Amino acid sequence: MADKFAIITGASTGIGFELATLAAKQGYDILVVANEPLINAAANDFEQFGNTVTAVEADLSTIEGVDALLAAANGRQIDLLCANAGHGLGHAFLDQEVRDWRMVVDTNITGTAYLLQKVLKPMVARNAGKVLVTGSIAGYIPGSFQAVYNGSKAFIDSFVAALQNELKDADGVTITNLMPGPTDTEFFARGDMLDTDVGSDPKKDDPAKVAQDGWDALMAGKASVVSGWKNKLQSTLANVTPNAVLAEQHRNMAEPGTAKD
């Protein structure tokens, strides 16, 4: 058993898989979770680094799912949390089923907030711990045809900044917001966005590079990091661009049928 223990959510593929790989390489015992059986295959990959790996299949859109994840830690001190689990959804809001957009809200907002509250309390009590939350540059942009998803990431970006202020006197506890742009993961397929300009773009960011940027910022105790120079530029411009313009720009890349041949 290693001295260090980390939890990584959404770890079956993509950015979460890469974050779990980095944690295992750095000598952490890890508890990994995803809402699919693939998490067990991912755990086999992480075991090659010689540390203890525990995999949990749980739905983090529910309080019960988060509780099941934390119960799997068996009371062990959590030194590091990568709150990466998220859910995306494309198409026009009025065409979406309530159960589908509720899954976005419950996973990205409710489940994340509850998990952070449960993990941060003991971290603050002992003045030690690191938390990485996967936000998004989408939080800066009114997301036409991804309205609920972008709204959920706007919550995360604001929520993390507020927590950082509330906990500024908690020496030894840091919270870092990782804000990627479009990344080459299963996100767009799962969100039914492969027929969109952004979903079909072959030049998405490498999840391993995004994870490394987040990990480096986490270890350095930084408040936030935008991964990739194009995303840094886009997030900067979003602060000075009217919302109506941003929404139209987002429509052009996220509306169904905009995929380029």
Predicted segments, located by residue:
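Conserved glycine-rich cofactor-binding loop
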Residues: 12-13
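Conserved glycine-rich Rossmann-like NAD(P)H-binding loop of the short-chain dehydrogenase/reductase
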Residues: 26-42
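Conserved NAD(P)H cofactor-binding loop of Rossmann-fold oxidoreductase domains
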Residues: 84-89
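Substrate-binding pocket helix/loop in short-chain dehydrogenase/reductase
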Residues: 92-93, 97-105
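Active-site helix of classical SDR
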Residues: 116, 152
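Residue(s) in the substrate-gating loop at a strand-loop-helix junction
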Residues: 136
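SDR active-site lid
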Residues: 165-229, 240, 244-247
